Amino acid sequence: MRGKRMNHITVSGLVATEPRSFLTAEGVHITSFRLAAQDRHFSRNANSWVSGDTNWFTVTGFRALGSNAAESISKGDRVIVYGRLRLRTWGDNKMAVEIEAESFGHDLRWGTSVFSKRFYQLPEASDNLRTKYDVDEAETPEIHAKAA
């Protein structure tokens, strides 16, 4: 079962460690943190909220996601993570549950968030290329004014 990838998973939980961020020698930004996800449900018998077991995940984001996470996510934040689940085993009955994140962000059930869109510089060779989806500012001045 070593390194075997399974289906995608969506998990909500608490960022339990300060995110660790670094840049590889190849220039790939990586950010990872531990996520604690605890099931809670209302018990009619007890007439109160009951906490279930806590599941622990190591969440890792690469490239732009890793870079943005480093500036956006902090220990104690409530987040929702979507990505590929990977179970890594070693030794006698030791296992790590990892999520290679494709997307994550703050869980707005618990608070508010302010989004800032990032603009990345395209390589010079691509500057003159336009796709059918490109829109000139003169064609939609009201949209560009709102974005500014």
Swiss-Prot record:
Chain ranges of the SSB domain: 6-108
Highest taxon above the source species: Bacteria
UniProt GO BP: DNA replication
Entries under Gene3D superfamilies matching the protein: Nucleic acid-binding proteins
Molecular functions (GO terms): single-stranded DNA binding
TM annotation in the entry: none
Assembly mode: Homotetramer.
Protein name per UniProt: Single-stranded DNA-binding protein 2
Origin species: Tropheryma whipplei (strain Twist)
Gene name of the encoded protein: ssb2
